[in-house]
UniProtKB/Swiss-Prot annotation:
Claim: Transport is one of the keywords in the record: yes
Transmembrane segments: 17-37, 62-82, 98-118, 125-145, 154-174, 179-199, 209-229, 268-288, 296-316, 337-357, 368-388
InterPro entries attached to this UniProt entry: Na/H_antiporter_dom_sf (IPR023171), NhaA (IPR004670)
Reactions catalysed, as given in the entry: Na(+)(in) + 2 H(+)(out) = Na(+)(out) + 2 H(+)(in)
Keyword tags: Antiport, Cell inner membrane, Cell membrane, Ion transport, Membrane, Sodium, Sodium transport, Transmembrane, Transmembrane helix, Transport
Gene Ontology biological-process annotations: regulation of pH
Residue stretches in coiled coil: none
Organism encoding this protein: Aliarcobacter butzleri (strain RM4018) (Arcobacter butzleri)
Source species, domain of life: Bacteria
Protein name, UniProt field: Na(+)/H(+) antiporter NhaA 2
Length: 396
C-alpha cells in the first residue's frame, strides 16, 4: 500500500505543475488569438497534415491531430490511472470507492440538469459543465500550500478519477457520429486479441501498443470518438495485483506493465499533450456580442460549473452518509467537501474538449469557451477562499 500512496503523491505533484503550465499556455493562446498574430495562430492549427502508407490515407488539420490522436494518448494515461486505482488504490474497495463515486455522480448530474433546464433546444451541450480539470484543480491546491489538508488532495484526486471515467462514458455514448458497423467488427477483433494477450499474461508492452494503433484506426472509422481507443487499451494492459506492494516503485514498475506504461507516458501527457491541447484550443477571440447572442448556453455552462458542481458533490455525499450508503473520509470536514466542490467546477481543458464535440457551430464554441474560462476562474477563487478561511479558523 506504500507504493500505492507513493504513486498518488507522484501523480499529484506532476498534475500540479502541469496545471500551472496550462494556466500560462492558456493566457498565451488567448493573447495571441486577439493580437495582430491571431490570423497566423488560426491558420497554423487549420493546416492539413496527412499520412500516406499503402492503402492508408489520413489527412486532418493540425487541430484534429491534437484532439483525436494526442488526446487518445492522454485518455490512455487516464484509463491506466483509473484501472490502477480500481485494483490497488483508493477505489479498490467498496468502502473506499463509494464516497468519491457518489461525489462525482452528483457533480455530473446536477450541472447537466441545470444546463438542460436552460437549454432544451441545445441539449447536446449538457456534457460541458460535467467535466473537471484535475491538473488545474490540483494546481490551485498547490498554490495554497500547507493551508490544505493532505486528505483533501487525496479526495480531489479520487473524485477526479471517477469524474474522468464519467466523462469517458458520456463521450462514448452521447458524442458519437454516424456509426459504421463493419469497423466495429474490426475493432472488436483487434480488442479481442489484446485481451487474449492479457489472458496469457504477456508482459511486454510492444504488442499491446502496436495493436492499440490499429484499435485507434478502426474506432476512428466507426464514428465513435477515437479517444475512446486509449481508454479501452488501458483497461486491457495487465497489472500484477499479487506484486509485493511494499517494494520500491522501480521494482513495481518492472513487474507491472500498467505502472511501467503509466510512468512512461505521464510526463509526456502532462507536460506536452495537455499544454499543446490548451494552446491549440484555448485561443478564442474575445467577442462579448457572441456571448450575448448565445447567452443561455453560456449561462447554462456557467451555472453548471459554478453552482451545479459544488451543490451536486456536497448534496449527494451528505445524503449518502445520512442514509448510511457511504462514509465520509477521516480528517475531511463538510466545509472541505463544499470547497472541493467549487474546485470541481474548474472545467477548463476537459470542458473545452467536450465543447468541440457538443457543438458544430464555431461561434457557439467560441462563446462557450469564454464561459468556461470565466466560470473556471470564479469557481477556483471561491474554492480557494473557502479553504483559506477554513485554514485560518483552525490556526492556533
Amino acid at each position: 500500500m506504500k507504493n500505492s500512496l507513493f504513486l498518488i503523491k507522484d501523480f499529484i505533484s506532476k498534475e500540479t505543475l502541469s496545471g500551472l503550465i496550462l494556466f500560462v499556455v492558456t493566457v498565451l493562446a488567448v493573447t495571441i488569438a486577439n493580437s495582430d498574430f491571431g490570423s497566423y495562430y488560426f491558420e497554423l492549427f487549420s493546416t492539413q497534415l496527412g499520412i500516406n502508407f499503402g492503402q492508408l490515407n489520413a489527412s486532418m488539420s493540425l487541430l484534429h491531430w491534437i484532439n483525436d490522436v494526442l488526446m487518445a494518448i492522454f485518455f490512455l494515461v487516464v484509463g491506466l490511472e483509473i484501472k490502477r486505482e480500481m485494483l490497488i488504490g483508493e477505489l479498490s474497495s467498496v468502502k473506499k470507492a463509494s464516497f468519491p463515486i457518489i461525489a462525482a455522480i452528483g457533480g455530473m448530474i446536477v450541472p447537466a440538469i441545470l444546463y438542460i433546464s436552460l437549454n432544451p433546444d441545445h441539449i447536446t451541450g449538457f456534457g460541458v459543465p460535467m467535466a473537471t480539470d484535475i491538473a488545474f484543480a490540483l494546481g490551485i491546491l498547490m498554490l495554497l500550500g500547507n493551508k490544505v489538508n493532505p486528505a483533501i488532495k487525496l479526495f480531489l484526486v479520487t473524485l477526479a478519477v471517477v469524474d474522468d471515467l464519467g466523462a469517458i462514458v458520456v463521450v462514448a455514448i452521447f458524442y458519437t457520429n454516424e456509426l459504421h458497423f463493419e469497423y466495429f467488427l474490426y475493432a472488436f477483433a483487434v480488442y479481442s486479441i489484446i485481451w487474449f494477450l492479457n489472458y496469457k499474461n504477456v508482459q511486454k508492452l510492444t504488442p499491446y501498443i502496436i495493436l492499440g494503433v490499429f484499435l485507434w484506426i478502426f474506432i476512428h472509422k466507426t464514428g465513435i470518438h477515437s479517444t475512446i481507443a486509449g481508454v479501452l487499451l488501458a483497461f486491457a494492459i495487465p497489472l500484477n495485483k499479487k506484486a509485493d506492494l511494499e517494494e520500491s516503485v522501480e521494482n513495481l514498475s518492472v513487474d507491472n506493465p500498467l505502472v511501467k506504461l503509466e510512468h512512461a507516458l505521464h510526463n509526456f501527457s502532462a507536460f506536452i499533450i495537455m499544454p499543446l491541447f490548451a494552446f491549440a484550443n484555448a485561443g478564442v477571440i474575445i467577442d462579448f456580442s457572441n456571448v450575448i447572442e448565445h447567452q443561455l448556453i453560456v449561462l447554462g455552462v456557467a451555472l453548471g460549473l459554478i453552482i451545479g458542481k459544488p451543490i451536486g458533490i456536497f448534496s449527494f455525499t451528505y445524503l449518502a452518509t445520512k442514509l448510511k450508503i457511504s462514509v465520509k473520509p477521516e480528517n475531511v470536514t463538510w466545509n472541505d467537501i463544499f470547497a472541493v466542490g467549487f474546485l470541481g467546477g474548474i472545467g477548463f481543458t476537459m470542458s473545452i474538449f467536450i465543447s468541440h464535440l457538443a457543438f458544430s457551430d464555431q461561434t457557439i464554441v467560441g462563446a462557450v469557451k469564454l464561459g468556461i474560462f470565466a466560470s473556471s476562474v470564479i469557481a477556483a477563487i471561491i474554492g480557494s477562499v473557502l479553504l483559506i478561511l477554513k485554514a485560518k479558523k483552525v490556526e492556533p
